[in-house]
């Protein structure tokens, strides 16, 4: 995939109507935004376009309204908060059909530097099916398209891909540019040693990632629930731990592939276990890889955490996707904390692949110590799998 895409700085936007696909899919509680990270992330692109005298038309989805208007998924709270953040009124075009009379009038009345926000794009059932009718309507409002929503770049929707069939100028915003720089470099030309850490519950979610990364990394670290399927593949007992029986054979193949490729594949050598999945369960540390009958693994053990941390400390590039244990339970958060600490203390390029690992790093307060925290869980995974992301492929090459 070609990651060398035109950015907003490569196009002349003065006086032009610029449709910007943002990721404003933020959590709401009683109409109040509870996590503003995605709004903050969008500001550099919006401010640049304002300074350059563009007419800025923002669009985004929120949640899953499934093709019909749902008041609780309206982008009105986003318009209000953005107005405060930008010190400028963001006009909210509240049309149930997204591109309706309000939107058309608001866009018609725009002056250079003005900002309009359209209603939730997923109010339209055509959006997720990438149907031409809605793509055309969105494109009819603008002269130029800018995609700055990495979180949905792996989806071919009207507002990420369809509009580019009708707007010949299509570039990426600063957020996507940053994602492409860090993730692209890690996958294409990493500074070595290159260490990747994969955690989370399921091997099946990460099958292609494991396979693709074994062709690229020097060390691959496996933790979290998926570690137990690998332990079983090595012939250890895993008690009542999470296991995907149908992936044991695949795990064996990956262990063999790592040997063939000369990749250092690190798997748990001890575990923190309990007799039930409960935040108040008493943690027990196993002596080795084996987990006794009646117990389930809920975190990597201290010896494993030390080995993983040492591998991270010797790296020049580290990519991490997925926690090492049930980090929501204090007794089983230590593995994730140790990995996060090792990355925070490292001089390497450290990249967090969105989703649960990003949440863990931010909750633990290590966010500022990482080189890059990806804004897209699913998108960053597909990127690490080596897949082409349709929302990026659709943009103009440099």
From Swiss-Prot:
Query: Which keywords fit this entry according to its UniProt record?
Result: ATP-binding, Cytoplasm, Glycolysis, Kinase, Nucleotide-binding, Transferase
Top-level class of the enzyme under EC nomenclature: transferase
Q: In which pathway does it act?
A: Carbohydrate degradation; glycolysis; pyruvate from D-glyceraldehyde 3-phosphate: step 2/5
Which cysteine pairs make disulfide bonds? none
Q: Where is this gene product found?
A: Cytoplasm
Q: Name one GO biological process term.
A: glycolytic process
One of the Pfam families matching this protein, by short name: PGK
UniProt cross-references to InterPro entries, sorted A to Z: Phosphoglycerate_kinase, Phosphoglycerate_kinase_CS, Phosphoglycerate_kinase_N, Phosphoglycerate_kinase_sf
Give the record's subunit note: Monomer.
Similarity comment: Belongs to the phosphoglycerate kinase family.
Provide the protein name: Phosphoglycerate kinase
Native organism is: Clostridium botulinum (strain 657 / Type Ba4)
Recorded name of the encoding gene: pgk
